[in-house]
Amino acid sequence: MNQAMKLDNIMAFIKETNTESIEDKNFIFGYIEPKFSKYLLFQAGAVADLKNFLVFFTNEEIILVELNHSGDFTGRINHLERKKIADFKYKSGLTQTKIIFKYDDIRLVLKTPQVVLTSKWQMTNLKYLKEKNFFWK
């Protein structure tokens, strides 16, 4: 349980997937909430539709590695080419950051907490990505 939130396991996962362009600080934890209409229809079902990700930023792409609700790797990986990303916005709030962009005309709102209690690397990595302007190169 919660294996994908441990730094050693993340580094092992990077080696397994042979993604050499990933550094040790250019990833964060994030999630995509279900649409508001799902909350109106069936609240408990909407919570189950929440998608958790480890989000890796490279020069060529954004990689979304899906996690289950227990915080373990599911094996599903999405590679989003930076060439196909449009309308990229980054909004930093007090408790969470929103990364909003369009990919193939689909609007994605990725939310990421400023602090994750089980992952001390979250705040450090967010700060690193902001300083290096890695969210949009």
Residue ranges of model-derived segments:
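Anionic N-terminal interaction surfaces
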Residues: 1-55
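Short flexible/disordered coil segments
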Residues: 17, 82-96, 119-129
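Lipid interaction determinants
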Residues: 19, 25, 96-98, 113
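Short, surface-exposed, charged/polar-biased interaction segments
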Residues: 31-35, 83, 106, 129
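Phosphoinositide-binding peripheral membrane targeting modules
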Residues: 42-54, 58-100, 107
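Canonical phosphoinositide-binding patch of PH/PH-like domains
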Residues: 105-125
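A membrane-cytosol interface segment of integral membrane proteins
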Residues: 130-137
